[in-house]
């Protein structure tokens, strides 16, 4: 029996994780849940999974939750500190880190310092502070199992092979809803169009990141830290069918790939059951039914966010943290219909150009770069 705490339990990854857990009551229990936006959903989760402690976004939400639950309720915490408390709590063997954005960094680090193995769905944790996180994981003998489908595919394709035998990692990208949209048409893209991903069902923020290809850029940075691979050995190929989730090419010319239907429950099940496997509930892969698989190069001219991510990784220091923070602000502004689709990349680019990078050592120094970039990007959005 493995006990889990889930950070971001009411989001897309959290709901999918609980769906896998629901299928295997003999294999998984829930110690803690943390959520940010849906107290009503959290109430249902508490009644079904009976966690010992939970966290919500703020004091008002905590009071609302306590009122809804009545006398029989778990310990209730709130804010980033509350999520960190849930992450580090005794009783959990593994923490599923699925809070969206840089807000997941502090709770994930708390879990690592408490010696919890991590099922990592929050790629921003590695983007913002990859060196710090990997150093802490090594220090506390913590295993980080990626939940992103691409990194899960690479993780599985690397097992049993030597690091020095790897020629390169190949991340696949669906291309998003605008794969064949012209640069001129991209300037007129609506929010509703951008939220219609052709293959994956995800939250709003990651869906927009997929449309701009920033999601793939963030995944390149995450892969660098997870697999100790330099930027020039991490490639991206567009694969619209989203059946091959990523590949590893070895020095002998052999390529290992992981295939499956595009359903996040598969990499989630792999991560939370590791090193065993368990049924995930996804549709079975039927290659004759799919018929053919296609591939093409990404277009950096139409999708500059991918280029910006590579540039931030090459520059290092605080640049990836600034890239991520500026993107979070720009995407939020697009979701609020305050800026256009192509303004997202422009905001990120201008924020990065204004930044004087430095080498962070402490968590606070990483967070300071994050705060600076958010303020800069907010100013750019207001003037857009």
Curated annotation (Swiss-Prot):
Pfam family, one: DXP_redisom_C
EC number in record: 1.1.1.267
Top enzyme class: oxidoreductase
Binding of Mn(2+), residues: 148, 150, 219
Single GO MF annotation: 1-deoxy-D-xylulose-5-phosphate reductoisomerase activity
Binding sites annotated in the UniProt record for 1-deoxy-D-xylulose 5-phosphate: 123, 149-150, 174, 197, 210, 215-216, 219
InterPro entries associated with the record: DXP_reductoisomerase, DXP_reductoisomerase_C, DXP_reductoisomerase_N, DXPR_C, DXPR_C_sf, NAD(P)-bd_dom_sf
UniProt-annotated binding residues for NADPH: 10-13, 36, 122, 124, 203
Keywords of this entry: Isoprene biosynthesis, Manganese, Metal-binding, NADP, Oxidoreductase
Annotated coiled-coil segments of the chain: none
Disulfide bonds: none
GO biological process, one term: isopentenyl diphosphate biosynthetic process, methylerythritol 4-phosphate pathway involved in terpenoid biosynthetic process
Gene3D superfamilies: 1.10.1740.10, NAD(P)-binding Rossmann-like Domain (3.40.50.720)
Top-level taxon of origin: Bacteria
Cofactor(s) essential for the protein: Mg(2+); Mn(2+)
Catalytic activity, reaction form: 2-C-methyl-D-erythritol 4-phosphate + NADP(+) = 1-deoxy-D-xylulose 5-phosphate + NADPH + H(+)
Pathway assigned to this chain's UniProt record: Isoprenoid biosynthesis; isopentenyl diphosphate biosynthesis via DXP pathway; isopentenyl diphosphate from 1-deoxy-D-xylulose 5-phosphate: step 1/6
Database matches in NCBIfam families: Dxr, PRK12464.1
UniProt function note: Catalyzes the NADPH-dependent rearrangement and reduction of 1-deoxy-D-xylulose-5-phosphate (DXP) to 2-C-methyl-D-erythritol 4-phosphate (MEP).
Family label: Belongs to the DXR family.
Protein name (record): 1-deoxy-D-xylulose 5-phosphate reductoisomerase
Organism expressing this protein natively: Chlorobium phaeobacteroides (strain DSM 266 / SMG 266 / 2430)
